[in-house]
Design a protein with these regions (language model features):
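Membrane-interfacial terminal anchoring regions of lipid-handling membrane enzymes
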Residues: 1-100, 108, 173-174
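Soluble catalytic domains of membrane acyltransferases
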Residues: 80-175
Length: 175
């Protein structure tokens, strides 16, 4: 997206097509169908995921990734790459005593960062952890820094492999 002469933000053609598809799927009641044209993915198998971070290497990567992720997010905010104008309803998040499911439409790649920042602003940040359910391809296909974050920042990747999903469900029950 870029800003035009009139101050309006111009959206890229692929994003406009996704918006159109969202409207179409909403009319048809298809709320469980992905509107994105995602590339083919590498299947996540049980031996390639440690959902509960039981291995020492997984624990260390988790700590390091979350520390890096926190610095990355703080830098985005400091440099106005991400601007959070206001937060409504944080008192509801503060009332959560067990677990909660927070959804994010993830239309913008920074949507998840906003959810992360609001969670850190809440009273729950001290004694709870925010887990992110992510799509299989985000876990298996992404290289570099974002890939490292996707694999290690308290993420719970879905999988097209049934055995992996059994482990996913067990991990969710444990968490």
């Amino acid at each position: 997206a870029s800003e035009g002469n009139d101050g309006q933000i111009e959206k890229a053609q692929d994003r406009l097509e996704v918006l159109k598809k969202i409207e179409e799927f909403e009319r048809e009641g298809k709320f469980d169908v992905d509107v994105e044209e995602d590339p083919p993915t590498i299947v996540l198998t049980p031996e390639n995921i440690d959902y509960l971070r039981e291995k020492m290497s997984s624990k260390i990567k988790r700590i390091f990734a979350n520390e890096m992720g926190e610095r990355f997010l703080d830098n985005l905010l400091k440099n106005n790459k991400l601007i959070i104008k206001q937060v409504n309803g944080i008192e509801n998040l503060n009332k959560v005593k067990t677990g909660a499911l927070i959804t994010c439409n993830h239309f913008n790649p920074f949507d998840c960062f906003t959810v992360e920042k609001v969670f850190r602003m809440s009273e729950n940040e001290k004694d709870k952890r925010l887990y992110k359910v992510i799509r299989e391809g985000n876990y298996t296909n992404f290289p570099g820094l974002y890939g490292f974050f996707f694999r290690n920042c308290d993420t719970l990747p879905l999988s097209s492999n049934k055995r992996t999903m059994v482990n996913f469900m067990k991990a969710v029950d444990t968490i």
